[in-house]
């Protein structure tokens, strides 16, 4: 396709005239036909190894590294993928054009649950682990190839023949080495802690894998019976209680946690009331927050009287019976009151029941009061069922147990109120099912653990790294800061098969790691480098441990997949692609959800390994929504596939839509929006076609007119493009694309189509073919085209390449692509600033004249503007600007005659339009007094005779 050179001009296919104008043509078609042509360019880029040519051309330049956040290798790409990849491509290309060496190495995230689920669906749940791994690897490779093809079709240039994959053996090995580094530095520990747990996954979840959906649960007020009435009396300053029958009242939406209750929490500084009530004819005492007495009594349908008040701190240590203590000896235990600052009196009862196995705050509170790990009651198993040893409810799932638990509470008189409650609740992002906090033994990276070098904690290092990072948009900084400041320790371990193993040997009795763990991890990494993670599966411990093997177990946990992608600054930037890339990256770019995903995990791993962020800047984009602002989903039927858009409208339309949308918010798309984008594209394409057509008989080596020798309006056009290019490059530098598109559209439709090219047509079409006047215009157009094609190439990559193949001369287009070039260095215009000011004024006048001409035309006074003669009265700078054009003023106004006279003030200024009384020249269509004055050419005006048969007309300004 690239041999489609802009051949010397030829008359367009119109009826031959006796006096033809210079109507040149171009092989660059008016219709883009993008869906058909773009795949041909994709093939040409691949066949001619354009990406390799770009790398060769930019060797030695300063590097710009955009590190690709890896999409997950499962399923076809959707519109969100397209937005992400095209934004990255546009940024890489702008930096490349700006004089950097900007490589792009795409990557894929390959381990984890979704692929494991696919293998289970296809082959069943009972496959041997070795088969799961081999089939998962094959499946991931197949998905990578599918996605790769679609990404390439979008016009994204990159190292597609050597991407990175987190499942590459070298990456898996380097990930183990990274784990070893964190272990040696003292960040990694093993402990019992409540973690996000999905019953369907059968595994812990990362924070980024949790989403919130509405859920309906029983909300219950529950009484914990007094076990130490004397201490209650003392706390409230009473000699004796009126009755020993009483309850501490709690409120919860998780009845299933009641069997695991081990404590109650109050706030030490809040006032608590002792309330006397009669319930079912029996006097009873209730303890609850003083500020909530009225609300709780009303909710429970009770009336009562507050007989005493004390501060929460007075209740510390008082014990209460478990509600089921009288039903089964297994619940014959007491729950002490602990003080906790997280307790509030704005809802509930002001007393919080604490099940340390199923709540982070509960766990922290109980541990801080001396509870040992082996004392924590944890009856919920990994599949969501209660263990068989749990009295009354063993074998039930926690969700189906809610009803019998509430029934038993009612039976013993501890259920004060039950209502169904709708609230936002944690769900697994994969299965869309509710999850819980569940205390299990896991491996963690400690946020506040003192590392072995006695330096800053992980939290401190990461927060400092955020301060040193640039954010686009700026609000991303506060968002990431808040997440890091408040997050719990990172659960590194998962209970799955398809993932990088936490390849530890754990002592059977003590649970300690083997003393040679760092050395062993390196030996295992070397095996993984050769055979993949399968090497750990098949490893006989005796091969590495010798006689110690009988004392140790192979750890079965795998690493969180967020650790996989979060380590790519180490495994890719400094590992598999260290020759092409570099650490730290200049930019990470992903959707705004990645503040808790890839941005987050990458920051944590790099803070531990390197003491800094792996990126200098973070850029986030919003999500795609339909034309009405609704989230896209298959169920709503409002999705648009990028493949379909490319195959019908063309990828350049998709690219232009992305570039023209402010990606910092939601990106709206619909057929109607794409229709408007297509119209916008046509305007740009038609402008490019005009430029190509009118330089098709122009050879810059012979015909280029120096800027200083150009006509004034041509110098203005070059100066204006210089100013606009500077503005566009400033936007590109800060990753802003929608202002670029807006400026390009305005430039093509208003600056060129509505002014400069409109004026230029007369000179291009009617001046002598090789005249200075025409060559001056073509020289300006030649400069503008060089600049315009490169400015639009990062966005409209296919169209710019197609136009470049037509426009660029063989000596310039040595690589056969626009993408090995840099932004065009436009020539300086010595009087550029003055010309910009002057022509800004002239354009204002021209707009006024055009309005007057239109009024006369509508009234039937004239046909076209060339049928008019205009007399202007102007004052001050306006008069000076108009008068300076002399006889060329008529060309700027596109009238057959124009004159200007000076007046003293703006109030006296006027525009007078008069229909011409002269004949129309059959060639230039001007109405002139000298039409027919040449006997041999009766239909021509004097200037056309001069342009065709003489020295040509003299033009200085326009």
Curated annotation (Swiss-Prot):
It catalyses: tRNA(Ile) + L-isoleucine + ATP = L-isoleucyl-tRNA(Ile) + AMP + diphosphate. One of its GO terms (biological process) is isoleucyl-tRNA aminoacylation. A motif ('HIGH' region) lies at residues 71-81. It comes from the Bacteria. Zn(2+) binds at residues 921, 924, 941, 944. Residues 1-32 are annotated as: Disordered. It is an enzyme of class 6 (ligase). It is found in: Cytoplasm. Pfam families: Anticodon_1, tRNA-synt_1, zf-FPG_IleRS. One of its GO terms (molecular function) is aminoacyl-tRNA deacylase activity. HAMAP family: Ile_tRNA_synth_type1. Belongs to the class-I aminoacyl-tRNA synthetase family. IleS type 1 subfamily. Catalyzes the attachment of isoleucine to tRNA(Ile). As IleRS can inadvertently accommodate and process structurally similar amino acids such as valine, to avoid such errors it has two additional distinct tRNA(Ile)-dependent editing activities. One activity is designated as 'pretransfer' editing and involves the hydrolysis of activated Val-AMP. The other activity is designated 'posttransfer' editing and involves deacylation of mischarged Val-tRNA(Ile). Monomer. IleRS has two distinct active sites: one for aminoacylation and one for editing. The misactivated valine is translocated from the active site to the editing site, which sterically excludes the correctly activated isoleucine. The single editing site contains two valyl binding pockets, one specific for each substrate (Val-AMP or Val-tRNA(Ile)). This is Isoleucine--tRNA ligase. The lineage of its organism: Bacteria, Pseudomonadati, Pseudomonadota, Betaproteobacteria, Burkholderiales.
């Amino acid at each position: 396709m690239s041999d489609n050179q802009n051949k010397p001009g030829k008359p367009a296919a119109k009826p031959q005239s006796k006096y033809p104008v210079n109507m040149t043509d171009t092989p660059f078609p008016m219709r883009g036909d993008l869906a058909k042509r773009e795949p041909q360019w994709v093939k040409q880029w691949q066949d001619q190894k354009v990406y390799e040519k770009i790398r060769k051309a930019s060797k030695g330049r300063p590097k710009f590294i955009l590190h690709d956040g890896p999409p997950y290798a499962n399923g076809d790409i959707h519109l969100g993928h397209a937005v992400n990849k095209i934004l990255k491509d546009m940024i890489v290309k702008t930096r490349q054009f700006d004089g950097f060496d900007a490589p792009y190495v795409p990557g894929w995230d390959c381990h984890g649950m979704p692929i494991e689920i696919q293998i289970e669906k296809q082959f069943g749940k009972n496959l041997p682990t070795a088969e799961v791994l081999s089939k998962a690897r094959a499946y991931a490779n197949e998905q990578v190839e599918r996605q790769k093809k679609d990404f390439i079709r979008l016009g994204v240039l990159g190292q597609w023949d050597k991407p990175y994959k987190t499942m590459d053996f070298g990456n898996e090995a380097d990930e183990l080495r990274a784990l070893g580094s964190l272990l040696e530095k003292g960040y990694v520990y093993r402990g019992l802690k409540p973690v996000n747990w999905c019953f369907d996954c059968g595994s812990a979840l990362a924070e980024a894998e949790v989403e919130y959906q509405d859920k309906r649960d029983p909300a219950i007020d529950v009484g914990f019976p007094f076990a130490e009435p004397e201490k209650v009396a003392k706390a409230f300053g009473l000699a004796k209680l009126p009755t020993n029958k009483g309850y501490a009242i709690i409120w919860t939406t998780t009845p299933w946690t009641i069997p695991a209750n081990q404590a109650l929490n109050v706030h030490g500084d809040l006032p608590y009331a002792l309330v006397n009530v009669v319930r079912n004819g029996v006097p009873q005492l209730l303890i609850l927050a003083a500020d909530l007495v009225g609300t709780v009594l009303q909710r429970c349908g009770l009336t009562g009287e507050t007989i005493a008040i004390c501060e929460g701190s007075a209740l510390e240590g008082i014990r209460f019976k478990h509600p089921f203590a009288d039903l089964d000896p297994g619940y014959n235990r007491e729950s002490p009151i602990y003080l906790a600052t997280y307790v509030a009196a704005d809802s509930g009862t002001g007393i919080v029941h604490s099940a340390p196995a199923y709540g982070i705050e509960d766990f922290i509170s109980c541990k801080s009061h001396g509870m040992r790990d082996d004392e924590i009651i944890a009856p919920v198993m990994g599949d969501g069922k209660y263990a068989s040893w749990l009295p009354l409810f063993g074998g039930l799932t926690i969700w189906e147990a809610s009803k019998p638990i509430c029934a038993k509470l009612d039976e013993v008189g501890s259920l004060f109120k039950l209502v169904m409650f709708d609230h936002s609740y944690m769900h697994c992002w994969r299965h869309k099912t509710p999850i819980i906090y569940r205390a299990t033994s896991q491996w963690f990276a400690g946020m506040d653990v003192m590392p072995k070098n006695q330096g800053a904690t992980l939290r401190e290092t990461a927060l400092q790294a955020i301060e040193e990072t640039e954010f686009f948009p700026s609000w991303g900084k506060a968002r990431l800061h808040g997440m890091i400041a408040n997050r719990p320790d990172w659960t590194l371990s998962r209970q799955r098969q398809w993932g990088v193993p936490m390849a530890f040997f754990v002592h059977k009795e003590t649970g300690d790691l083997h003393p040679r763990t760092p050395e062993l991890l390196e030996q295992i990494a070397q095996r993984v480098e050769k055979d993949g993670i399968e090497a750990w599966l098949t490893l006989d411990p005796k091969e590495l441990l010798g006689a110690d093997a009988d004392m140790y177990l192979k750890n079965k946990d795998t690493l969180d997949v967020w650790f996989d992608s979060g380590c790519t600054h180490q495994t890719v930037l400094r590992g598999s692609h260290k020759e092409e890339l570099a650490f730290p990256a200049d930019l990470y770019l992903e959707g705004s959800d990645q503040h808790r995903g890839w941005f987050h995990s990458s920051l944590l791993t790099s803070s531990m390994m390197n003491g800094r962020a792996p990126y200098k800047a973070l850029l986030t984009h919003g999500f795609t929504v339909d034309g009405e602002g609704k989230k896209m989903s298959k169920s709503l039927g409002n999705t648009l596939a990028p493949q379909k858009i490319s195959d019908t409208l063309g990828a350049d339309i998709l690219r232009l839509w992305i570039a023209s949308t402010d990606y910092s918010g939601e990106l709206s798309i619909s057929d109607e929006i794409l229709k408007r984008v297509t119209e916008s594209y046509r305007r740009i394409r038609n402008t490019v076609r005009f430029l190509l057509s009118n330089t098709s008989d122009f050879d810059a080596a012979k015909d280029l007119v120096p800027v200083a020798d150009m006509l004034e309006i041509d110098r203005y056009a070059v100066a204006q493009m210089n100013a606009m290019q500077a503005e566009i490059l400033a936007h590109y530098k800060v990753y802003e694309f929608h202002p670029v598109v807006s400026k390009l559209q305005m430039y093509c439709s208003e600056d060129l189509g509505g002014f400069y090219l409109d004026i230029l047509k007369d000179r291009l079409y009617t001046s002598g073919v090789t005249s200075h006047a025409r060559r001056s215009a073509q020289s300006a157009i030649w400069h503008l085209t060089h600049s315009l094609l490169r400015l639009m190439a990062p966005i409209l990559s296919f169209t710019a390449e197609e136009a470049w193949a037509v426009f660029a001369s063989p000596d310039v287009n040595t690589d056969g692509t626009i993408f090995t070039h840099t932004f065009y260095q436009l020539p300086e215009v010595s009087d550029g600033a003055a010309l910009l000011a002057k022509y800004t004024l002239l354009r204002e006048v021209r707009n006024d004249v055009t309005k007057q001409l239109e009024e006369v035309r509508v009234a039937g006074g004239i046909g076209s503007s060339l049928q008019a003669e205009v007399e202007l009265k102007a004052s001050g700078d306006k008069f000076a600007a108009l008068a300076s054009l002399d006889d060329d003023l008529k060309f700027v106004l596109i009238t057959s005659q124009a004159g200007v006279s000076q007046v003293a003030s703006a109030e006296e200024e006027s525009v007078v339009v008069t229909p011409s009384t002269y004949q129309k020249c059959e060639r230039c269509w001007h109405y002139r007094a000298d039409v027919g004055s040449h006997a041999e050419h009766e239909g021509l005006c004097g200037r056309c005779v001069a342009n065709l048969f003489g020295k040509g007309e003299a033009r200085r300004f326009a």
